Amino acid sequence: MEINRLVLPGIEADERPIIIAGPCSAESREQVLNTAQELAKNGVKVFRAGIWKPRTKPGGFEGVGTVGLPWLKEVKQKTGMLVATEVATAAHVFEAIKAGIDMLWIGARTAANPFAMQELADALRGTDIPVLVKNPVNPDLELWIGALERLVNAGVNNVGVILRGFSTYDQKIYRNLPLWHIPIELRRRYPNITMFCDPSHIGGKRELIAPISQQAMDLKFDGLMIESHCNPDEALSDAKQQITPQILDFTLKMLVLRENVQTTENISVLRKQIDEIDEQLLTILAKRNRISREIGMYKKENNMPVLQTGRYNEILEKRAQMGEAMNLDKEFVFAIMKAIHEESVKIQLAL
């Protein structure tokens, strides 16, 4: 699959960051127009608003529906901004295109459902409308890529992605964990893909929008999708993660865009050291696996079980203590040792 850079009317190919902003939900004509006009004054080129809102639980505000589409059309006419909304069904696609919507995005819950993605791909077949795909709710890169493949296979080639974070049971700082390594790997596989970050959904609160946006810029994301409302405290959905157009403007002006520069000699030297250390790590892991295989042979010959829980717990505890003494994060050490142990078990089971 080949993915090229997203093409948006009126936006230069090298423009960065591309800002998509607007309320979580279109609630009324007045709210939509007031917010859009303030955003347009500040140079935002793409206005977003949810018309249909798939909620985690029933009973919450689920959007105004098709009655809100003329409001977006009016935004386009009065401000010149492109307008975007979320679609989750083929009917949404048909209604949005009929109303002249310029850009669509597919939400996290929909992206996680191959049946829904195929329905949308079929509905979009033959169109050239830009489509952004949010990451699935669970951290599965292949599922994300699969959603993109369904669109591309249907001839929908003007596509990009939005990182909105991943759902976890144990929520601490973030509403949805960014897990930056996943979009980084996506970029590695598809270097030309256009990537947006949604700091509103990642952070879940206003005060996290600025730092998450800066992190995204440092990681060379192409743009940001940020929820902005003329009166966020009165918003009917996700009030805590929306900011006023004025605060958005201030936030964007504070972003630092680091230019691409040639690697300095010092960094080259340090990277060479990293390469050498990685080689040593792999050599040591290979040696460990050989010893693990010998232990496995002994267990097999003496009718001993492969998995010995006491030994495993001892390894985890002692290695965590060793790691802490070396200023290594405990969870990081646990993750490494668990992966190494799983490989050892796999080797011994194969004997």
What would you call each of these model-derived segments?
Residues 64, 80-93, 102-117, 129-141, ...:
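Catalytic beta/alpha-barrel core
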Residues 260-351:
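Domain-level signature for soluble enzymes in the chorismate/prephenate branch of the shikimate pathway
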Residues 61-85, 120-130, 180-195, 241-260, ...:
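Alpha-helix-loop-beta-strand connector modules within alpha/beta enzyme cores
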Residues 48-67, 230-239, 295-306:
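Glycine-rich, proline-tolerant flexible connector loops at the mouths of alpha/beta enzymes
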Residues 17-23, 45-49, 83-85, 104-106, ...:
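Hydrophobic faces of well-ordered beta-strands that scaffold small-molecule active sites
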Residues 17-34, 58-60, 81-87, 107-108, ...:
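Active-site mouth loops of central-metabolism enzymes
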Residues 12, 116-250, 262-265:
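Catalytic alpha/beta core domains of metabolic enzymes, predominantly
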Residues 1-20, 69-70, 74:
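N-terminal amphipathic alpha-helix/helix-capping segment at the start of soluble metabolic enzymes
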